[in-house]
Amino acid sequence: VQPGKGYSITYDAPALAPRRPLVLRERSVCVTAWASGFRLGSTMEFSGFDASLNARRLAALERGAAEYLHVPAGPAARERWYGWRPMCVDDVPILGPVPQHDGLWLATGHGMMGMGMSAGTGQLLADLMTGRAPAIDPAPYSPARFARG
């Protein structure tokens, strides 16, 4: 698992602000709206645990939004932010018990899909931990796929 760095900019609401979430697919920009403002978010940067903000990445968010939104930036940027997403080398989450480490379970490596996969991940782990038959085959997600031997 390695960090994938995603960026966002949160703005105060302009007079003409988005009212619904938007995905600007051609520019890979997501817009999250609420009453007092909106957020532009996206990008994936593999830079280890570098804690700096990349101005080029932030500018790309604003350029992408400018192509689609009447007012692509609010009157004031409240926050310019990054967060690390757990990325798995094979782009498949790691879910299940860790071989040779009794009681240690993993649920990581979801990348940009963490929130969307959270309910399914929770259900799969709950089923495995309690001995219930899971609704899906857990083998593709097993930490054992990385075991040497």
PLM regions with names:
Residues I94, V98-G149:
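C-terminal lid/capping helical subdomain adjacent to the catalytic/cofactor pocket in oxidative enzymes
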Residues V1-D102:
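Active-site substrate-recognition segment that forms the wall
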